[in-house]
Amino acid sequence: MHNIIQRPMAINGQVVIRPMMYLALSYDHRLIDGKEAVTFLVTIKNLLEDPSRLLLDI
């Protein structure tokens, strides 16, 4: 994970500044299929965006 920094984003046709962080995943394609790796990364992204999901296990 990288630092959280303020970056411009287009939201509803407006440019707004939002906190953003890059998240990367490395995996060995001989052991793990790309679909499972992406599914895992999306799950981590969703939990970071809404930690209450992790605490409430939903």
Swiss-Prot record:
Annotated transmembrane regions: none
Coiled coil start-end: none
Gene3D superfamilies: Chloramphenicol acetyltransferase-like domain (3.30.559.10)
Record SUPFAM superfamilies: CoA-dependent acyltransferases (SSF52777)
Keywords, sorted A to Z: Acyltransferase, Lipoyl, Transferase, Tricarboxylic acid cycle
Pathway(s) it belongs to: Amino-acid degradation; L-lysine degradation via saccharopine pathway; glutaryl-CoA from L-lysine: step 6/6
BP term (GO), one: tricarboxylic acid cycle
An annotated Gene Ontology molecular function: dihydrolipoyllysine-residue succinyltransferase activity
Catalytic activity: N(6)-[(R)-dihydrolipoyl]-L-lysyl-[protein] + succinyl-CoA = N(6)-[(R)-S(8)-succinyldihydrolipoyl]-L-lysyl-[protein] + CoA
EC category name: transferase
Active site: H29, D33
Cofactor: binding details: Binds 1 lipoyl cofactor covalently.
E.C. number: 2.3.1.61
Cofactor(s) listed in the protein's UniProt record: (R)-lipoate
Gene Ontology cellular component terms for the protein in this record: cytosol
Biological role: E2 component of the 2-oxoglutarate dehydrogenase (OGDH) complex which catalyzes the second step in the conversion of 2-oxoglutarate to succinyl-CoA and CO(2).
Family listed: Belongs to the 2-oxoacid dehydrogenase family.
Quaternary assembly: Forms a 24-polypeptide structural core with octahedral symmetry. Part of the 2-oxoglutarate dehydrogenase (OGDH) complex composed of E1 (2-oxoglutarate dehydrogenase), E2 (dihydrolipoamide succinyltransferase) and E3 (dihydrolipoamide dehydrogenase); the complex contains multiple copies of the three enzymatic components (E1, E2 and E3).
Protein name: Dihydrolipoyllysine-residue succinyltransferase component of 2-oxoglutarate dehydrogenase complex
